[in-house]
Amino acid sequence: MGKRLGRTLALAGVQTSQKSESELIDMFHDIMKTGMHGICFSLYEDGQEPGDIIGEEQVRRRVEIIKPHTEWVRSFSCIEGNELIPRIAKENGLKTLVGAWLNDDTEKNEEE
């Protein structure tokens, strides 16, 4: 597990299959306490999926959840509410890496 300024950089190389459930829970709590350098961020809550339009209030709620635990967020799209992430993240002191979800749908790709 890589660390930077006390924050977890990556879990690459951690052999989770060789850890007990108790050890995994302890690892999770340690990571949440010390924080992560960055995290991939999804706006969706239970029952939601890509294609659903996500409002600003939900984006703010989701950012508030992760804010104490990370410095960076990576998003996966620039439409359907995801376009709100960079501004709201910045308002909360987080940096962003914005992604675009591309596929065979040229029109949707242009929106992204």
Feature names for model-found ranges:
Residues 2-65, 69-71:
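Boundary/entry segment of secreted carbohydrate-active catalytic domains
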Residues 68-72, 92-95:
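Loop/turn elements at helix/coil->beta-strand transitions in domains of secreted/extracellular proteins
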Residues 40-42, 74-76, 97-101:
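A cross-family glycoside hydrolase active-site/sugar-binding cleft signature
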Residues 72-84, 103-110:
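Acidic-and-aromatic substrate-binding clefts and catalytic sites of carbohydrate-active enzymes
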Residues 87-112:
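Substrate-binding cleft of extracellular glycoside hydrolase catalytic domains
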Residues 25, 60-63, 82, 86, ...:
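Generic structural signal for well-ordered alpha-helices
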